[in-house]
Amino acid sequence: MQGVKVLSLSTVFPNPAEENLGPFVRHRLQHVAKVHDVEVVAPIAVIDYAERRFRRPGIPVSRQDGPLHIHHPRWVYLPWGGYTSAFCLAARLMPFLHGLRREYSFDVIDSHFAYPEGIAAALLGSAFRCPFTITLRGNEVMHVQSPGKGRWIRWALRRAARIITVSESLRRFAISNGVEETHVRTIPNGVDPDVFYPRPRTETRFRLGIPEDRPVIVSAGFLIERKGHHRVVRALSEIRRSGSSAELWIIGGPGREGQFEEHLHREVRRHALESFVHFTGNVKSAVLADYMSAADVVCLASSREGWPNVVHEAQACGAPVVATDVGGVQDMIPAAEYGFVVPAGDEDALAAALRKAIETRWNRAGITAWGRARSWQQVGVETAEVLSQAAAETKGRLKP
């Protein structure tokens, strides 16, 4: 495979102020960089969701992260701007990329998410006569329902040289929105096997301060409504009413989709679960793997996802998963030997599945083998192939 120069565009690439942001983008690009040259443009919003804590003046304009050279140009994000935010992003990046291209003559633009990056990539691809790709990761299903955003998302999708989707459901979504089948490839996310592997349960629980004699549920993700931690709290209340001594560990910190942490604490107090629900805040990936190894079951109660990495990461640690039927979950839990899938929003079904998972004797070695089957190295190779194909195409070289 001949190497090409890739310019990757992502507003969710991890940065020094938000280390837990979009690790799936970073993992993929680190392995793509073993095949192609990769430079990352990860714009930082000057006003991000109008929340002061997301204004990040301390982030460097450029930095090196292993094989990746990363640029952090600033741009003004207008949360009320709708589809115009994508145009604001493209307008800000136009002069920046003119300067960058004098030093780095990129062959293809690799954008993550259709909005705002994919629309911006289509505009930039037209200006620079450069092919571009879009990776669909799940939020497009919501954004396309907006008349303004939907029109421009479909416009960008049809003009991309290639579309990458992280699940088969998103592949079907792309095709239903006008993308040619031959231009879509599904490349699910991977797992880092050096981080996510089973730890000795007794020793790990002791180190984390988790009682050995209690069933443990772990719910991991940003403390935002979409992740559904509040639904797990309510499920725990139902489970404990049936006589179980189960406890819940919620792992994660504030996210970009609004403040929801206080609501979670109110929900805990409303059900008198203060002694049985534990908040850890943000943790490193290795510590997350510790909690997953210590868990009887990991729960994902999201209302919307693309390819939720937490499912395979938990399985790689040997933990069964109870998850709502969103995004690629059916592909990640294809059989009851790996966990249970329940309808999104059905809290009775969620509580029943968690109770059943706690009572089931699982083949944790089999769960581990399934969860570790797909590595980021494999993802990198497959993505590099698509980017090579895109760079050789003329479809993305639009007329200005």
Predicted regions located by residue number:
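Conserved acidic donor-binding segment of nucleotide-sugar-dependent glycosyltransferases
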Residues: 335-336, 340-347, 355-361
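Short alpha-helical donor nucleotide-sugar binding micro-motif in glycosyltransferases
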Residues: 282-283, 290-295
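Conserved donor-binding/catalytic core segment of Leloir-type glycosyltransferases
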Residues: 7, 211-227, 233-236, 249
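Nucleotide-activated donor-binding/catalytic signature segment of Leloir-type glycosyltransferases, i.e.
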Residues: 261-283
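Short hydrophobic beta-strand element within catalytic cores of glycosyltransferases
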Residues: 311, 320-323
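N-terminal subdomain of nucleotide-sugar transferases
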Residues: 1-66, 71, 396
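Glycosyltransferase donor-sugar binding loop
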Residues: 191, 220, 247-265
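Aromatic "clamp/platform" in nucleotide-sugar-dependent glycosyltransferases that forms part
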Residues: 303
